[in-house]
């Protein structure tokens, strides 16, 4: 074949022209074909293919036209909408790869991993930063080696640099060719159906998508059907490129879209971090923001601290005027002042854990709920516990290090006024004090409270402490649960200790019981209610499902008169596991449903045993291919085989306040989505009811639709987790015709869109969803996003859609992103007209 230069197109030409012409050559007896491709403002070399005219037209001509059209697309891509998509597509090195920051780090790793100057294939992934995708990396390595025409299993540093340049280059077409070569192992320029199956299975393994791997034949057939329209049995590079560069259609002509673009631009400018040059003004602004966002907590803490200081001062001054002050001095005033705060705090610490009272107050009184931070009840319980620890320290140190020594070393004349408190016999040593009732009761209380306090810390309660096995058995939730019930003994000892105190003889001066009477009776009354209320009776288990990811869902009958609000939680007791333990779980059914449901993830001994019990029940019925086990009362003849359950509740939680907002932003991590699913179900039920009213099929339904828009973001690590709430996802897609609920599911095991490891999955997802309306990752009608959300973009999206509105942000899950979400809510509230109010779940 010979090449000739082609003249550039004329300036006024508007269309690309492809033409074939037969012309003469140096040898007039030989036929040849010249193919000329003219592109506006570009010049491309042409190729003359020497051969018989019939042969060229039947085969090679077709191939060359495809190649040249591919070249023309390369030139035109820079002017297309897909340009940005192409630039960020098919990246082999992810943004968060540990060594994906430059060649220097890769070279350093090569020096550490190389053996005799060569890097083995097994170390290639570690060297370039693709540590978690060994199979994919091996195929990439072999493809790069094949391109060099060798079959070596190790490479030099020079070869590694060449490979690095290829996989990190800016050219999408070069990366596309590498990806194509990974599949096209015989380098014939064609990908067969079997090779498509291999690359699908490889991509599924790299992204931990086991279900896609199980259905690889179906998905390979789908790709071949889409790309091999002529039924040739193979696809070529240009077919793959066409599919990979498909981008979602976007409407840019509507006024709303134009307005949103303008708002987006405005928000981006407003949200640029700025720093006020005046430090005083900046400090004042930060203080004002702090008070506006935390005023409920501030007034409660201020009141609590003020009461503690007042009680301490009152008792301090009282004892300063007494005779004992002349012998014991300020030691006794500090001891008695701290003792008074201890009485108050030991009474107060019970109130935040009176769950029924708190639930009743936050449900029945909006006024009280608007000024009291009920969401922080457990945090306040911990703050009061810290206050008790400080009080114990001051009280004990003042006695042991100051009071008692001064009393032991007092002269007879000095001790004379103390005889009416201690008797004629003078104390001789510390043992004398310890033998007294107030001595041994005080020490016992301190020991018991210390045990309960230590075992309540998260590193012990959640078995995070690095302890020997023999000691590890003494930690965990069970240890926390039972040690906290030592408070019964502590309160009995506290009353005894207060009654036998040395320096107060009159009964009306022994005030400990006065402080404790109301809180203790209230708490005792609550425990009696839990024991005898209808909600604490046995419930009938209607359905059980065991999902991938160690999640157990229980569907139970709703007790008569049982009323709750979406977002609340209940306590569950299973006597077959432990007759004494009650564990809290968010309700996942909506208040309008005729059943109760919870989803329980196994994270400890109790939940593991509960799942094991119900798994045995679920093994008899038929199972689905995904590993989902189900047992249904409608299919079972003997209900008694279900373990007996008791429930207690419902109890209030932050998520129940969602009805105070027209717009909701719901964020759940993993199993933390449970209270939010209940909210979604409630909004969905309202949509169904509204549709029934509009159709006239049911005129007796209460028309209550407070929520106008709900954005739900659910982030989970495993593909199997997406099955937990697949039913509600499909219902939203079916009934929410007006788009009131916007669902976004994120699977973090899949590499972000644009990564070469997820490119085929993304392509396959689009094809399958377009054809069947089902997402291949979740198995629902809701498309799954990959990697993690950009939370700033999420807040911007909501702010653009809801100008001058209040948005309730409700989060439940791991604490890892609480800080980020809270900062974003504050930032957008301060700099935009959309006000985000952040709420988080406590347990």
Swiss-Prot record:
A Pfam family this chain is assigned to: Ferric_reduct
Residue positions, PTM Phosphoserine: 268
GO molecular function: calcium ion binding; NAD(P)H oxidase H2O2-forming activity; peroxidase activity
Ranges for domain EF-hand: 171-206, 215-250
Predominant cellular place of this UniProt entry's protein: membrane
Superkingdom, natural source: Eukaryota
Assigned EC number: 1.11.1.-, 1.6.3.-
Domain Ferric oxidoreductase: 336-495
Ranges of residues in domain FAD-binding FR-type: 534-657
Region of interest (Disordered), residue spans: 1-27
PROSITE patterns on file: EF_HAND_2 (PS50222), FAD_FR (PS51384)
Keywords: Calcium, FAD, Flavoprotein, Membrane, Metal-binding, NADP, Oxidoreductase, Peroxidase, Phosphoprotein, Repeat, Transmembrane, Transmembrane helix
Membrane topology type: Multi-pass membrane protein
Cytoplasmic topological segments: 1-297, 405-439, 504-511, 681-843
Gene Ontology process terms (BP): response to heat; seed germination
EC top class, as a word: oxidoreductase
Annotated GO CC locations: membrane
Sites where the protein binds Ca(2+): 184, 186, 188, 190, 195
Assembly information from the UniProt record: Monomer and homodimer.
Family assignment from sequence similarity: Belongs to the RBOH (TC 5.B.1.3) family.
Known role: Calcium-dependent NADPH oxidase that generates superoxide.
Name this polypeptide is given: Respiratory burst oxidase homolog protein B
Name of the coding gene: RBOHB
């Amino acid at each position: 074949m010979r090449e000739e230069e082609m003249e550039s197109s004329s300036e006024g030409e508007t269309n690309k022209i492809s033409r074939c012409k037969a012309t003469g050559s140096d040898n007039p007896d030989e036929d040849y074909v010249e193919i000329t491709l003219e592109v506006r403002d570009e010049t491309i070399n042409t190729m003359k293919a020497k051969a018989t005219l019939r042969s060229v037209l039947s085969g090679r001509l077709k191939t060359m036209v495809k190649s040249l059209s591919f070249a023309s697309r390369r030139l035109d891509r820079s002017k297309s909408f897909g340009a940005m998509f192409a630039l960020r597509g098919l990246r082999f090195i992810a943004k968060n790869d540990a060594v994906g920051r430059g060649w220097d780090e890769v070279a350093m790793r090569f020096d550490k991993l190389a053996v005799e100057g060569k890097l083995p294939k097994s170390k290639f992934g570690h060297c370039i930063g693709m540590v978690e995708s060994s199979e994919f990396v091996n195929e990439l390595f072999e493809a790069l080696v094949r391109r060099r025409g060798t079959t070596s299993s190790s490479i030099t540093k020079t070869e590694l640099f060449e490979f690095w340049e290829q996989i990190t280059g800016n050219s999408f077409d070069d990366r596309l060719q590498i990806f194509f070569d990974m599949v096209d192992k015989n380098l014939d320029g064609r990908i067969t159906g079997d090779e498509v199956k291999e690359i699908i299975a490889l991509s599924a393994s790299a992204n931990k998508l086991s279900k896609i791997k199980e259905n690889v034949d179906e998905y390979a057939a789908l790709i071949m059907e889409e790309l091999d329209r002529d039924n040739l049995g193979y696809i070529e590079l240009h077919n793959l490129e066409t599919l990979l560069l498909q981008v979602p259609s976007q409407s840019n002509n509507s006024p709303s879209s134009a307005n949103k673009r303008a708002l987006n631009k405005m928000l981006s400018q407003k949200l640029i971090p700025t720093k006020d040059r005046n430090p005083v003004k900046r400090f004042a602004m930060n203080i004002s923001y702090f008070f506006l966002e935390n005023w409920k907590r501030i007034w409660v803490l201020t009141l609590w601290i003020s009461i503690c200081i007042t009680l301490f001062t009152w008792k301090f001054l009282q004892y300063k005027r007494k005779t004992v002050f002349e012998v014991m001095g300020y030691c006794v005033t500090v001891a008695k002042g701290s003792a008074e705060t201890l009485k108050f705090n030991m009474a107060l610490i019970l109130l935040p854990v009176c769950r029924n009272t708190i639930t009743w107050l936050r449900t029945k009184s909006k006024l009280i709920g608007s000024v009291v931070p009920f969401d922080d009840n457990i945090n306040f319980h911990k703050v009061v516990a810290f206050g008790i620890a400080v009080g114990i320290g001051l009280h004990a140190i003042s006695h042991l290090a100051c009071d008692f020594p001064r009393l032991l070393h007092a002269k007879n004349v000095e001790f004379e006024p103390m005889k009416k408190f201690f008797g004629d016999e003078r104390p001789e040593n510390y043992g004398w004090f310890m033998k007294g009732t107030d001595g041994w009761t005080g020490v016992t209380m301190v020991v018991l409270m210390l045990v309960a306090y230590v075992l309540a810390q998260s590193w012990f309660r959640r078995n995070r402490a690095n302890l020997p096995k023999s000691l590890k058995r003494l930690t965990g939730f069970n240890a926390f649960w039972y040690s906290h019930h030592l408070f019964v003994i502590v309160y009995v000892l506290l009353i005894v200790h207060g009654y036998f105190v040395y320096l107060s003889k009159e009964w009306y001066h022994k005030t400990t019981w006065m402080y404790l009477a109301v809180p203790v009776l209230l708490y005792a009354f609550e425990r009696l209610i839990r024991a005898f209320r209808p909600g604490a009776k046995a419930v009938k288990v209607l359905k059980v499902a065991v999902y991938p990811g160690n999640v157990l869902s229980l569907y139970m009958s709703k007790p008569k008169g049982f009323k709750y609000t979406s977002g609340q939680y209940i306590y569950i007791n299973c006597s077959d596991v432990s007759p004494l333990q009650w564990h809290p779980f968010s309700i996942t059914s909506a208040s309008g449903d005729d059943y109760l449901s919870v989803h329980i993830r196994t994270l400890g001994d109790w939940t593991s045993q509960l799942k094991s019990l119900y798994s045995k029940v679920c093994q008899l019925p038929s199972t689905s291919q995904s590993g989902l086990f189900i047992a249904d009362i409608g299919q079972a003849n003997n209900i008694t085989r279900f373990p007996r359950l008791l429930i207690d509740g419902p109890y209030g939680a932050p998520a129940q306040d969602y009805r105070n907002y027209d717009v909701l932003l719901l964020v759940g991590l993993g199993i933390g989505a449970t209270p939010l699913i209940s909210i979604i179900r409630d909004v969905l039920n309202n949509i169904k009811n509204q549709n029934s009213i509009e159709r006239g099929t049911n005129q007796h339904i209460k028309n209550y639709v407070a929520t106008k828009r709900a954005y739900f973001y659910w982030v989970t690590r495993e593909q199997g987790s997406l099955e937990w709430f697949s039913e509600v996802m499909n219902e939203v897609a079916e009934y929410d015709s007006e788009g009131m609920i916007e669902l976004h599911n994120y699977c973090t095991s899949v590499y972000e869109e644009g990564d070469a490891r997820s490119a085929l999955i993304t392509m396959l997802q689009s094809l399958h969803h377009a054809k069947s309306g089902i997402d291949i990752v979740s198995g629902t009608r809701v498309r799954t996003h990959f990697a993690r959300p950009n939370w700033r973009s999420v807040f911007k999206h909501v702010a653009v859609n809801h100008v001058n509105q209040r948005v309730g942000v409700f989060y439940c899950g791991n604490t890892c992103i609480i800080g980020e979400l809270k900062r974003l809510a504050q930032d957008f509230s301060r700099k935009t007209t959309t006000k985000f109010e952040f709420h988080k779940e406590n347990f």
